[in-house]
């Protein structure tokens, strides 16, 4: 890991420059000859290959029960602290699908120490924020607070995941809340299309199920289901206590030992295995000619977090880029697909994505088109994918690498995104990858590597397709698959 840097300031001596080039000072003497200082004398000040980086160190400690404590101290007056748990909808089956998300909702409904009102008042009085979310492979509970309130924030998080009452009345009341949330999700067409995409790409597997679960499960999940899920999955080796901002690692470590050291024991017997999820090239079409626009997602199988091809696929994803009609630039856009789309008025917007899981992933593109341009837009996408496999240039790759590094650094703006990055990376890699290492891995990608990796994962592969809306003109699946091997002019 990158060591914490010591900031050094070098004060210049009057009349001298600290760069290794010549300084020219004109004299007002009669000869008016220039006098030179410097030359090779300051060559020793040139930068060394290894530079001192002002990057806070991510400190990691593992407790005896397997729980990992990770933190980054930036010295500010606020902090974010949270619990990242290796448990999501992928660990569910058909009968209890939706339990992880239901449990997230129940976390703030009261504990053995605090009623729901007491919990809300305590958070409000601290000026803090308490939140949670569930994904297909992770469940997260986190709090944002003043640095001085770190002990209280950790105690509240520990109370939530270990002492929730899970009262029957609260469970029944929360069913209606989740059902209304499901109705809201169904109005978000992008969410709907991505659920369809997972359903067709990972048919009859855990990744093919939704995070919220089907309606019948939401109506039938019991307190026993929630308790069983906690007992099975909320174990020390599968939990990371992460913090960022103004936090002292030793203080956080002592808090973790006090609140979690004796309670979150390791698994007794076998650790629940992550169910394998096989990718299937296939499609889901939901035609509705009453809708004004067609929503379409097309993806190929990618790789998991730790696969060596992950970085190269991220660069390829950046090469495709994003676009919508509000963008300026026209034919001067860096993305070739954006240029084609803008020039031909092929769609309202498109967004490339690279979704990674533990052992698999989805790499593709989501687009919103008018009925008349669906086929042309899909053809343009596949043509651009084939170009990635055969003709991408070094200048394009260099530009994409710079953009990828910039976007990654801009996302780490504030204690909350940094804390999320720490927690996620600890679960995925069992370490926090230092930024210089990540930049070096991105810099190692070249055009030849992009062509090889894209050929490996894109060329000749059957994609997964989810389409919704007026999609009458969408080509049939066999034609789409054939265009993954060659393109017509």
UniProtKB/Swiss-Prot annotation:
Keyword line: Hydrolase, Metal-binding, Metalloprotease, Mitochondrion, Protease, Transit peptide, Zinc
Catalytic residues, chain numbering: 104 (proton acceptor)
Binding site for Zn(2+): 101, 105, 181
A GO CC term assigned to this protein in UniProt: mitochondrion
Regulation: Binding to PMPCA is required for catalytic activity.
Predominant location: mitochondrion
GO MF annotation terms: endopeptidase activity; metal ion binding; metalloendopeptidase activity
Catalytic activity: Release of N-terminal transit peptides from precursor proteins imported into the mitochondrion, typically with Arg in position P2
Boundaries of the annotated transit peptide in chain numbering: 1-45
InterPro entries in UniProt: Metalloenz_LuxS/M16, MPP/UQCRC_Complex, Pept_M16_N, Pept_M16_Zn_BS, Peptidase_M16_C
Names of the cofactor(s): Zn(2+)
Function statement: Catalytic subunit of the essential mitochondrial processing protease (MPP), which cleaves the mitochondrial sequence off newly imported precursors proteins. Preferentially, cleaves after an arginine at position P2. Required for PINK1 turnover by coupling PINK1 mitochondrial import and cleavage, which results in subsequent PINK1 proteolysis.
PANTHER family: METALLOPROTEASE, MITOCHONDRIAL-PROCESSING PEPTIDASE SUBUNIT BETA
Protein name per its UniProtKB record: Mitochondrial-processing peptidase subunit beta
Organism annotation: Rattus norvegicus (Rat)
Gene: Pmpcb
């Amino acid at each position: 890991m990158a060591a914490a840097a010591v900031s050094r300031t070098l004060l210049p001596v009057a009349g001298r420059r600290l760069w290794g080039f010549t300084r020219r000072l004109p004299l007002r003497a009669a000869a008016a000859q220039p006098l030179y200082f410097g030359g090779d004398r300051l060559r020793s000040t040139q930068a060394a290959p290894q530079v001192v980086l002002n990057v806070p160190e991510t400190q990691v400690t593992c407790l005896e029960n397997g729980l990992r404590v990770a933190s980054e101290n930036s010295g500010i007056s606020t902090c974010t602290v949270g619990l990242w748990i290796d448990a999501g909808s992928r660990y569910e089956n058909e009968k209890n699908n939706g339990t992880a998300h239901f449990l997230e909702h129940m976390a703030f409904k009261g504990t053995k120490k605090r009623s729901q009102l007491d919990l809300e008042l305590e958070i409000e009085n601290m000026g803090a924020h308490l939140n949670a979310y569930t994904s297909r492979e992770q469940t997260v509970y986190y709090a944002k607070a003043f640095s001085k309130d770190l002990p209280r924030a950790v105690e509240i998080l520990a109370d939530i995941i270990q002492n929730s009452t899970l009262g029957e009345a609260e469970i029944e009341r929360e069913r209606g809340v989740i059902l209304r949330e499901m109705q809201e999700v169904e109005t978000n067409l992008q969410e709907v299309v991505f659920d369809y995409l997972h359903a067709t790409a990972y048919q009859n597997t855990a990744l093919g199920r939704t995070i919220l679960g089907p309606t019948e499960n939401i109506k039938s999940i019991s307190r026993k289901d929630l308790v069983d899920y906690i007992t099975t999955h909320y174990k020390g080796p599968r939990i990371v206590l992460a913090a960022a901002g103004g936090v002292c690692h030793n203080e956080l470590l002592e808090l973790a030992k006090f609140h979690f050291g004796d309670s979150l024991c390791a698994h007794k017997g076998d650790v629940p295995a992550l169910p394998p999820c096989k990718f299937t090239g296939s499609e889901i079409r939901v035609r509705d000619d009453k809708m004004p626009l067609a929503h379409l997602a097309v993806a190929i199988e990618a790789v998991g977090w730790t696969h060596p091809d992950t970085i190269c696929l991220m660069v390829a994803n950046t090469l495709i880029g994003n676009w919508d009609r509000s963008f300026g630039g026209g034919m001067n856009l860096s993305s070739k697909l954006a240029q084609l789309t803008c020039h031909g008025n092929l769609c309202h917007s498109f967004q490339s994505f690279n979704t990674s899981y533990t052992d698999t992933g989805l790499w593709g593109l989501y687009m919103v088109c008018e009925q008349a341009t669906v086929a042309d837009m899909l053809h343009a996408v596949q043509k651009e994918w084939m170009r990635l496999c055969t003709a991408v240039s070094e200048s394009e790759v260099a530009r994409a690498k710079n953009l990828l590094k910039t976007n990654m650094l801009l996302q780490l703006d504030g204690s909350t995104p940094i804390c999320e990055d720490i927690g996620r990376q600890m679960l995925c890699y069992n370490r926090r990858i230092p930024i210089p290492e990540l930049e070096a891995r991105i810099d190692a990608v070249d055009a030849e590597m992009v062509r090889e990796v894209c050929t490996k994962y894109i060329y000749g592969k059957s994609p997964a397709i989810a389409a919704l809306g007026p999609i009458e003109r969408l080509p049939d699946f066999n034609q789409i698959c054939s265009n993954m091997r060659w393109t017509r002019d």
